[in-house]
Amino acid sequence: MSSEPTSSIESDNLRRSKRKKFKLDFVAAAHGNNQKKSRKDPHGQGDDDDDTFDDDLNHFEPLSVLTEQDVSMEMFEDDEEDTVSRRRTRRSTAHFQDYQEPDRWIENSGPHACHKCPSRYESKSSLANHTKMHLGEKRKFACELCDFSASTLKSLTHHNNIHQNFGVLSQQTSPVIPVASSADSTLNSSINSTGCQINAPPAPKLDEEAPIAVESVVVHHEDVAEFDTTPPPILEREDDGPPVLIREAPVRKSNRPMKPTQKAQKMTKQRERKSKTVESPKGSLPSSSASSVTPPPVRKDVEKPKIFVKTTKKNLKKTMKITKVRQRCPHCPFTTSTVTRLNRHSGGHKLKEGYICPSENCNFMCRKAGFLQKHYILHKGTLPWPPEYVKKGGAKMKRTFPESEEKKIEVTEKVQKMKKMHKRRANTVQVVAKAQLKSYIKVEVDDVIFKKCNIGECEFLTQTLTQLIVHKVKTHDTKTAFPQHRFLCLTCGHRAKSYAALRTHKLIEHTSTHKRFHRTYYLKECVGDKFFVKYNLSKVQEEVKEEPKEADGDESGDESFDSMCPASDVHPETLAAIEMKDVFFCCNMCPYKAPTMNRCQRHYDKHFKNDEFKCQYCSWSSRSKEVIVNHEKLHPTVVVANTNEAPVVKNEIEAKVEVLSKTVSSPVECTEESSLSKSIQLWCQREKLRHPELDEQFTRKMIDGVKGFQCTDCPYTSKYRGDMRSHKKRHDIEQLYRCVQCTYTTNRPVSLKDHLKQHAIVNMSIADIKSRRVVVNQGVKIGMRRGVGKDKIYCCDKCPYVTLALGCLWRHHRNHRDTAKINICSNCSYSSIDQRKMEEHTIIHLGLGLNEAVPFVKRVDQKGRPVSSLTDLNSEKMNERKSTKRKMLDKVEKMEVGEDEEDDEESVDKGTDDGDYKQRPEKKRKQSSEEPASDPELFGSSSQPTRQLSERATRNRINYSLLSKNGSGKPTPSTSSANLEKLAGSSGGASSESPEPDESVEVSHWKIRTFLRSEYGVKESLKCPDCPYKSSEPDVLEKHRYYHMTKTTPRPYACSDCTFNTYTPTALLQHLKLHSEGVYFDPMVKKHMKHRKGDSIPPGVKGYYCKNCSFKTSIHRNFIEHSAYHRQQLINRINITLKRQPPRIEYQRPKLKHQFVAKNAKYCKKCTFKCVSQSNFIEHLDRHGWNQLYKCYSCDYSDNTKSVVDFHQLNHHIVKDQTLHSICQSAKFRLENGVIQIPEFQTEKSKPTPDEFVSKTRGLLKCPSCEYFCHVSSELAFHMSVHHLTEPNARETISYLHMGLVPPKATVTTV
């Protein structure tokens, strides 16, 4: 390869060492040591297959140099394989292929070429790594033909091989092997003999049908001779400039061959130009290292081939756009390429008003001046600014369409006339609009005020507003001023758009009835005297007080002086009349008065101080001059006026009322104020003077010799101001239960009951004071009126309802109907549909009623007939009704049997055998043999009665709705009236005389409720349209439907059958149970379901498609079974997630100091039971009045299970309104059950004292004659001996309490 022989020994040794290294590398490659090199390295070797090599090295033959034909044929074979597989094999990318290639062979094919050297790569990442070798600092091994440098000799050797095979410059495409011929073969052999090798890599394969155009280079023998004789020039890196790059022919981006399905296309000149490739010039490089470089041989210059530019679609589009014919406007120089733009532009030539183009031959107009400026650019001139705006009759328009001068003059005259007419109409409209219908000018003629028309110079005068409005409508045509409001009220001038609106206005404004005084009286009763007086006197006080009262800064600390000192502009008599507070304490040295002793003492001390400012009438002094001025106003007039006044209080009040009447009538005349409002104000002023405590929250009262407080709205009293303030808050807030006599509200019915009892004591004291019958509504008597003045009350004549307002009594009495509605009170005829009203009514019976039975609410049907419930089964009326009905049925049955069997009269007369009843087919109820009554003598004496336990006894252990037998193995007795009488021990009467067969039909709460719902028209349950969920309440169904919608972000747990989605897995499990009802899923079918893809659905047949997989079928049953498979999978996944969740910390309810009570809690009227659930509340109420085996000591609660009754006694009777006897009974019960331990100093037989009973049952002893209460019985005995010794049976009760015994028939209660 080199022209100069190497003479140095070092070069020979270096070549020998390189040969040894190549041999070692060759042996290592044969053993597969370099298989794990990175494929992304553009210079690295690919992985070699181990199967192509043998383990024995002796079989390897020395490498043989191949000819160009062999290499070219081998490369063409590789290319054919690439086109078929479209993926390069490891062998094609390896440097050593079958170990028959030359040591300088390198593959250099790919769509990505380097612009500084002939290297080509398959990927952009490989090219990027290669370009980094051309950039940056110079490394240890650098190339002399380009700026390539590497840190290893192997990379440089690989780069030099590329230069040697493909030349110095960057190749544009993969070179194509020329067609072999005889001349070429001799040429190749001669070239190889000289040491120059011309190797060409394979060309990319094109379509098989398309012809391949190859540009071959023909070399003559003369050129070869010259090529051999001339020595190659020495290439120096410093002298050579940058190589001239030949333009690369376009290569397809995907580097894929053409599709085989493409049809063969004819060869054209343009395609021939595209298919031709240019062979890049080749150079030569030394085969050794960079230190021993020899220049490449000189080659003859080859003519540069012609370069043809590829025409793409974009270039074709550009040329097409240029050659298109542009559309031109006939009126102006505007041109465009589309018809739509031309039509849009021509619309500007057709406008009738706007900014017109100043050009003579152009009539283009636009509505904005900015667009006209863009248009005028086409005329190539300066646009005069501002442009001219032309309307329909403008001169500019006429210039474009020339007409005669006469027509122009006519048009201008018409336009001017029209303008004048419009101006006149606008002026008249403005004048009429300014002069409103109700406005006028006051004119006084002979001391009579007239109303003059204010439109123009009209001289119309009238005294009424209606005549003025009619005048304006007829004379001045005021309707035209407001064409949208054509309808006009001639009375007040109101305008309306429609006749209906005018009609409603007249009905509302001009047909009002006369205000009656009794309506105001009812309003006063409803809102109360306090609010009524303040509301009606607020206007009068504003008129009297011209200037607001300023707060006086008293530095001396006299807080009471600001409230007592009058304003400077108010008359002293008016001030005395407006005063509302009674004065209790007076100063001895001046006329100052104070409501408290402390304020009066502070004022009195200032008489003996020497401050800066002193009073001129007394020795009182102060540090503020304003305070002294206000103090001096108390001296002159008030003292003199008090000396001449009469001692009678009545005359004083009447004098003040006269003064106030003058102040009411003194202000400016008010035409709209009626005499009724004046009379109401005078009445309110009298009430305010008679009852000055209306403005106070509470008043003082002596309680047990101690100063206390009493509420001004109700009889509540307290010794402490804090308790009174908390009580007053109950009058201001709105809560669940409300008092009927005041504004007291509470959430607890027990508190309302205690509050009503305080009213009952006051009502009893005024029961006999002027009681009169109240008659309203055509002679209907609704109640009684008792008391006088402020203490007047109205009482219902059918129940203990009491109110302060007559209207409230009238509304209450309407609920005492002849035919009840759904709910009715057990103690009176009060009925209502609302359950809340019934609860409040029962509290009235408990609080205001005297010696009444405990009320409860009954249910009635639509006709007013009572509906039987479990609480009514023990009543005598129910027993009588059942027994009479049973007798009638028995008589009818006997008569039917007598007609059928006249011969067997004896069997009919007996009536005890059950065989006769079983033979009757029309009798549908079940009959059973009568059980013999249990005899206590047979089984020995026992403390408890022996009888059958009902299903209630085992309701906590087993679901009693499924019970058919109780624990004893015998059938459960029915809850008919006959069996209840037997269980209660009632013998005799009509029921004992007639023998009755026992019925084994079970009756429980859920059966009774379902029967009542079916009988009395309860609403049917509503079904969800998306899933099987049902509910009878629409609100609940609406909440369920909310989880079928996904308005927000989707929830994590969704159903597989419908659109239901929720936040918790447990809620989804509950929902999936609805879909699983009635669907049987066999777990053994899982495998078949999993691999089943579905059935083929013929056209026109309804199909069912699964939304979770590709299953489809036309059979609905198969679809249900398939969806059950998905549902079961979802259930299994949810169960697994629930099991894998970490255990939650058990919730520990915080210990509360006070018992928490829900706002919607329901309270029992007979005990202290309360709950939120309606079903639990009904179940508890049913046990009250149920005559069962075990009974409560304090109420009528009973049950067949002893533990249930024990729990009731321990928790539902926390000493509320019980007698001392019931307290002792409950305490005894607690002692027996171990809740209360017996004291150590007592034996088991001795009973605890009442003090221990009361203290351990958490109760307070209350005196029966007053409000006193205590904890110990000895204190109560002492209290009764001091205050109530004269009461009947008081001595006997006191003696029992002193001895620590329970008094017989005690009336002592607990709080």
UniProtKB/Swiss-Prot annotation:
Native source species: Caenorhabditis elegans
Keyword Cell inner membrane: no
Gene: spr-4
Designated name of the protein: Suppressor of presenilin protein 4
Compositionally skewed regions (Low complexity) per UniProt: 280-293
Compartments, record wording: Nucleus
GO cellular component entries: nucleus
InterPro entries hit by this protein: Zinc_finger/UBP_domain (IPR050688), Znf_C2H2_sf (IPR036236), Znf_C2H2_type (IPR013087)
Region (Disordered): 1-58, 75-95, 226-304, 544-563, 865-1002
SUPFAM superfamilies, alphabetized: beta-beta-alpha zinc fingers (SSF57667)
